[in-house]
Amino acid sequence: MDSQGRKVVVCDNGTGFVKCGYAGSNFPEHIFPALVGRPVIRSTAKVGNIEIKDLMVGDEASELRSMLEVNYPMENGIVRNWDDMKHLWDYTFGPEKLNIDTRDCKILLTEPPMNPTKNREKIVEVMFETYQFSGVYVAIQAVLTLYAQGLLTGVVVDSGDGVTHICPVYEGFSLPHLTRRLDIAGRDITRYLIKLLLLRGYAFNHSADFETVRMIKEKLCYVGYNIEQEQKLALETTVLVESYTLPDGRVIKVGGERFEAPEALFQPHLINVEGVGVAELLFNTIQAADIDTRPEFYKHIVLSGGSTMYPGLPSRLERELKQLYLERVLKGDVEKLSKFKIRIEDPPRRKHMVFLGGAVLADIMKDKDNFWMTRQEYQEKGTRVLEKLGVTVR
């Protein structure tokens, strides 16, 4: 709470999950799927102890997704369906989750780098007009990740459910001209894993079994350090084979798919996406920075988001960066490679890193009036109030 007794709420709206809670906390109070569903046919009023309503949101929508037409209001980190987004916020602030009187609260929201200005304006408008928050702040996700890690300068590799961003931050300011995005993230890896399992002969339904396959992915997938070696192991031995029990009791065996699915992050062509993979994109981003800042960036690469949780990802990233640096900068001179310092930070709680950074920032700033956009300022200026964030509003 701030000095006037107002609650300070932190809400990290991801493409796949909403993480929300309060300033100063170490963990989100609630984490739930960013999902809105409507029943396909009204056959029963209840399933188990869940009542079927015309509109289902979050956890309940996820549990009954096979009976619903489901919709994610956000795509690749950007709001595409504002009506459904409001349903999601109603659920977040309402009795099911935070249960707050929004008029007596301040809120810190997060946004992806390179977010269109229109998107940000609309979010602020909804927060003040629909929910009447007393103060609003919108922070860039990559900057919050670095705050959570106690850094002001570094490169954030943030890979969530809907989008992967590589975002250099210098002295607490994100550098939009150097920010790169890759439209491959958790959801695409899950889809690819479904495809690989179908090829193996297991029958999966893309929407109904999506959650099940996501859980298989989280439990069994990893990033291969040396892909040729992994493929050899998968072909010639059974060391990679793991059994997984599905919710209906069937047992499936998963082998090479364990590393083949996340490989799409490094080789986008596997899922028909053009462009370079995450390692080369990271290398290109740092090399495009000012020559004086490059060493700092190489030493402070911070992983963030659920899709960076694969075992083996940090070491593979480091291996590829060194290889690219050797080939393209040192022109193959191995002697000089020892001077090349690289450090990849993979904090254990990186899944909720953005929320943690937001909770730290909101707590430090809770009583600083010049930090928050206030309802009164919004009434006077409209969306021009965003100038307070240091964001130019066209």
Swiss-Prot record:
It is found in: Cytoplasm, Cytoskeleton; Cell projection; Nucleus. GO terms for molecular function: actin binding; ATP binding. Keywords: Actin-binding, ATP-binding, Cell projection, Cytoplasm, Cytoskeleton, Nucleotide-binding, Nucleus. GO terms for cellular component: Arp2/3 protein complex; cell projection; cytoplasm; nucleus; site of double-strand break. SMART domains: ACTIN. It comes from the Eukaryota. One of its GO terms (biological process) is positive regulation of transcription by RNA polymerase II. ATP binds at G160, D161, G162, R214, M215, I216, K217, E218, G305, G306, S307, T308, M309, Y310. Its main location: cytoplasm. Component of the Arp2/3 complex composed of actr2/arp2, actr3/arp3, arpc1b, arpc2, arpc3, arpc4 and arpc5. Belongs to the actin family. ARP2 subfamily. ATP-binding component of the Arp2/3 complex, a multiprotein complex that mediates actin polymerization upon stimulation by nucleation-promoting factor (NPF). The Arp2/3 complex mediates the formation of branched actin networks in the cytoplasm, providing the force for cell motility. Seems to contact the pointed end of the daughter actin filament. In addition to its role in the cytoplasmic cytoskeleton, the Arp2/3 complex also promotes actin polymerization in the nucleus, thereby regulating gene transcription and repair of damaged DNA. This is Actin-related protein 2. It comes from Xenopus tropicalis. The gene is actr2.
